[in-house]
Amino acid sequence: MMLHIPQVLSKAKVAELRALIDAAPWVDGNETSGTQSALAKRNAQLPEGSPAATQAGEAILDALERNPLFVAAALPQVVFPPLFNRYAGGEAFGLHVDNSIRQSRDGRTRIRSDLSATLFLTEPEDYDGGVLVVEDTFGAHEVKLPAGDMILYPASSLHEVTPVTRGARVCSFFWIQSLVREDARRELLFQMDLAIQQLGARIGADAPELVSLTGGYHNLLRMWAEV
């Protein structure tokens, strides 16, 4: 399941984070690449664990905790500390799959990457190219979102970033270990959650039918969750 989550960050918050990270030193993006990814990756990245990356990452994590759409879709158990990349001057990231296990440089965080997330920090009209292309069984999906919006997709997906031919594309990217590792099960729970919310608005949260459906949701989550 791919999901566009709008306005994870306000425009003012995006501007605040951009001022912070733009003033910080950047390094070769391959510092965090696996062997195969390093062959396809050309970009710059904020050093993992740097003061700017840590401060900006904490702001993003705070925003995610308050975002009900993200919580419902991802069912997050652990969110990897957000990283930051920048593409400019023809830089790109060829077709690849993210590593199945991610470990932070300090060794404090080690997760199974169930979901990948890209949070856009540049307005789409400010750069050419830089399209995130995610492949699944239905084909290739092109993603280029407003600053502050985020795309969430299975980490098992083949994906790439096309060359940036004008301007610079700055994003945050990170991975999520979900309480429910299988994408199909997560999607079913997400659809049930949305239906419960919509029905609650129409018939009332205390309607017997809704109480029964909510119980079914939690029993499925109980059956599938890994904690």
From Swiss-Prot:
Gene3D superfamilies: q2cbj1_9rhob like domain (2.60.120.620), Rabenosyn, Rab binding domain (4.10.860.20). It comes from the Bacteria. Residues 78-178 form the Fe2OG dioxygenase domain. Its EC number is 1.14.11.-. 2-oxoglutarate binds at R169. Fe cation binds at H96, D98, H159. Binds 1 Fe(2+) ion per subunit. Keywords: Dioxygenase, Iron, Metal-binding, Oxidoreductase, Vitamin C. Its cofactor is Fe(2+); L-ascorbate. PROSITE patterns: FE2OG_OXY. InterPro entries: Oxoglu/Fe-dep_dioxygenase_dom (IPR005123), PKHD_C (IPR041097), PKHD_hydroxylase (IPR023550), Pro_4_hyd_alph (IPR006620), Pro_4_hyd_alph_FE2OG_OXY (IPR044862). One of its GO terms (biological process) is DNA damage response. One of its GO terms (molecular function) is iron ion binding. SMART domains: P4Hc (SM00702). This is PKHD-type hydroxylase PHZ_c0292.
